[in-house]
Curated annotation (Swiss-Prot):
This is Phosphoglycerate kinase. It catalyses: (2R)-3-phosphoglycerate + ATP = (2R)-3-phospho-glyceroyl phosphate + ADP. One of its GO terms (molecular function) is phosphoglycerate kinase activity. It comes from the Bacteria. It comes from Listeria monocytogenes serotype 4b (strain CLIP80459). Pfam families: PGK (PF00162). InterPro entries: Phosphoglycerate_kinase (IPR001576), Phosphoglycerate_kinase_CS (IPR015911), Phosphoglycerate_kinase_N (IPR015824), Phosphoglycerate_kinase_sf (IPR036043). Belongs to the phosphoglycerate kinase family. Substrate binds at D21, F22, N23, R36, H59, L60, G61, K62, R119, R156. ATP binds at K206, G294, E325, G352, G353, D354, S355.
């Protein structure tokens, strides 16, 4: 990649600012999933090995008012990171000012500091989220070099990524480098055949991705709630299934443009209610009863998609095939996940979000080449958009 990576920087004796993505799920002040903290370890450990001083910061949730601060402190993250690194992580409960500056000045080579949630700066005028130039400049003044390892926020121009990078030599961390390599590789130079599998509820969320991938992929397999808008565009009866009526014409246009590249489900698991307790059965895609709704793909579609995947050299998957959180309608997602996991000769990528959670829940995570840490960021990358957080990293 043409961007600087952390290994391109001289880190010895340097104050290294690191934008990490520690936006982890919390419940009652406890971290319920530490994947994002674990994902940042290689970059942090490399900086420490090089005798740099690691100054870490991240956002956590949305913070608009003083009340929102409740439960949004990064203090529990500092404690967990300390356990994972096996060394002390100094936590500074502020985002600017003398306390933070003093703590940074006192840091020794090979030590780690984490300061408070960057979004606490959003309470007074959204300074973080609107990339306030003064804030970006101030944070940049706290370090000698900047490493951006937060792919999850790369699609946003914030003070803590773009703002700092505008004022300081910057590089991608190892996680960011990996994301650019795999997600960027799908868009720029995939090994072929490239098969994309897109699911999720709404066409509107995935229009850009479908449009872009139809120009790049050899096949695009569509599942999830958005299939019914495509079926309606073909004149099929979809009963009470989810429909975005204002997107039917658009779906029609995509179908015409796609030809046989776009593959839709041939059957559906239907029920009268959006519930795990109601009776359900499988029907062919063109005969969904008027009083029922499609909530998953059926076995014939799982078999069809499995067949379409055979021989693929690159597979990218984003979005569940049905209402994955209800066990009666999770079989499609499980089947597709398994089919991708069983491909031995392909680069297999999950574009974050619900699909990543599904693969982890099912114990298939280690069977995939890459699982993205950024749902929104990977989607925008797959749309072919330039990501501000990536673009702002110094060129080699």
């Amino acid at each position: 990649m043409a961007k600087k990576v952390v290994t391109d920087l001289d880190l010895k004796d340097k104050k290294v600012l690191v934008r990490v993505d520690f936006n982890v799920p919390m419940k009652d002040g406890k971290i319920t999933n530490d994947n994002r903290i674990v994902a940042a370890l290689p970059t942090i450990e490399y900086i420490l090995e090089q005798n740099g001083k690691a100054i870490l910061f991240s956002h956590l949730g949305k913070v608009k008012t003083e009340e929102d601060k409740e439960g949004k402190s990064l203090r529990p993250v500092a404690a967990r990171l300390s356990e994972l690194l096996g060394k002390e992580v100094k936590f500074v409960p502020t985002t600017r000012g003398p306390e933070l500056e003093k703590a940074i000045d006192e840091l020794k080579d090979g030590e780690v500091l984490l300061f408070e949630n960057t979004r606490f700066e959003d309470i007074d005028g959204k300074k973080e989220s609107k990339n306030d130039p003064e804030l970006g400049k101030y944070w940049a003044s706290l370090g000698d070099v900047f490493v951006n390892d937060a792919f999850g926020t790369a699609h946003r121009a914030h003070a803590s990524n773009v703002g700092i990078a505008s004022n300081l030599e910057s590089a991608a961390g190892f996680l960011m480098e990996k994301e650019i390599k795999f997600i960027g590789g799908v868009v720029d130079n995939p090994a072929r055949p490239l098969v994309a599998i897109l699911g999720g509820a709404k066409v509107s969320d995935k229009i850009g991705v479908i449009e872009n991938l139809l120009t790049k992929a050899d096949k695009v397999l569509v599942g999830g709630g958005m299939t019914f808008t495509f079926m309606a565009a073909q004149g099929q009866e979809i009963g009470k299934s989810l429909l975005e009526a204002d997107k039917v014409e658009l779906a029609k246009g995509l179908l015409e443009k796609a030809g046989n590249k776009l593959v839709l489900p041939v059957d559906a698991v239907v029920s009268k209610e959006f519930s795990n307790d109601a009776p359900f059965h499988t029907v062919s895609a063109d005969s969904i009863p008027a009083d029922e709704m499609g909530l998953d793909i059926g076995q014939a579609t799982i078999d069809l998609f499995t067949k379409e995947l055979q021989g693929a050299k690159t597979v990218v998957w984003n979005g569940p095939m049905g209402v994955f959180e209800l066990s009666n309608f999770a079989k499609g997602t499980i089947g597709v996940c398994e089919a991708i996991a069983n491909l031995t000769d392909a680069t297999t990528i999950i574009g974050g979000g619900d699909s990543a959670a599904a693969a982890m829940d099912l114990g298939f995570a280690d069977k995939f080449t890459h699982i993205s840490t950024g749902g929104g960021a990977s989607l925008e990358y797959l749309e072919g958009k330039e990501l501000p957080g990536v673009a702002s990293i110094s060129d080699k």
